[in-house]
Design a protein with these regions (language model features):
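Sequence/structural signature of beta-propeller domains
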Residues: 1-274
Length: 274
């Protein structure tokens, strides 16, 4: 993974603190951890469309009130948007059907309580930053930037009634002696590509100094780390989506969370060559 190229692809005006994205049919679907909109950006036309995920949606919500949408994943024709679970306000899951344009919203609190109870994760440690949904399994990427550093992958069969959750811990590489922790992930064939950032904080609520980001790979079958490389010393990359793939290289689109109220987002392209 040492051969990579990171470039600024474009800037989107109207989105701040981008926290996740999905590329589909020449469009980017983005979420912001300050907002209750889903943003649809057409790459060919450079047009931005805002989709309200809740009533009275807002672009910039106060930190104590925000639903903290940190994870977005594609499941069939649905985009699944998930709050981090790090406070009582952050337990919402929203599904957006890209065909019918219908929105379904529900409270995810019971599911998060089940995760905390089964896996002995305290309320101030839970911090879901990434999501992968397959036909059989749902994977949550727990960012272990709390006091106990519980960083890892939570997974279970995608059966809401009978879920038994498993936890696989991951000790990821450090940047300036601070561990990197998960910020997003995407599945490509049988390989999980993930982003992780180092932030000088022991709080799932308060932001700290950003020390950089890495990209890495995990074998889906063995759940073992297979590689990683630091891609930035300054950016906190929080969104990762597959863009293009060929025999010798793979391209991703990334977004970063600047932890500011400025309504503009830099979008990056990351190329990894064999």
């Amino acid at each position: 993974m040492e051969k990579f190229q990171l470039t600024l692809l474009f800037k989107i005006i109207g989105i701040g603190s981008a926290s996740g994205l999905v590329y589909h049919d020449e469009k980017l679907y983005l979420i912001s951890d300050n907002s209750t909109f889903l943003y649809e950006y057409s790459i060919p036309t450079e047009k931005l469309n805002k989709i309200a995920l809740v009533e009275n949606a807002q672009d910039n919500i106060a930190k104590k009130d925000k639903p903290d949408f940190e994870a977005i994943a594609l499941k069939g024709n649905d985009l699944v948007v998930l709050g981090s679970g790090s406070t009582q306000n952050r337990n919402k899951v929203v599904k957006y059907d890209m065909n019918s344009k219908k929105i379904q919203e529900r409270n995810f609190e019971k599911m998060y309580e089940k995760i905390k109870s089964q896996l002995h994760i305290s309320a101030d440690e839970l911090n879901i930053e990434g999501l992968i949904v397959t036909a059989e399994t749902i994977y949550f990427f727990q960012r272990g930037n709390g006091t106990n550093g519980k960083n890892g992958i939570i997974y279970a069969n995608d059966d809401a009634e009978n879920q038994v959750f498993q936890f696989v811990p991951f000790d990821l590489p450090k940047i300036k002696n601070i561990p990197t922790t998960f910020t997003d992930a995407v599945l490509v064939n049988d390989t999980i590509y993930f982003l992780a950032s180092a932030e000088d904080t022991t709080s799932t609520y308060l932001d700290g100094e950003v020390l950089g980001s890495i990209i890495g790979t995990i074998d889906l079958k063995t759940m073992k780390l297979t590689g990683s490389v630091q891609i930035s010393a300054t950016n906190k990359f929080e969104g990762l989506t597959l863009y293009k793939q060929s025999k010798n290289e793979i391209e991703f689109i990334l977004c970063e969370d600047t932890d500011s109220e400025l309504l503009e987002s830099n979008i990056y392209k990351l190329v990894i060559r064999d």
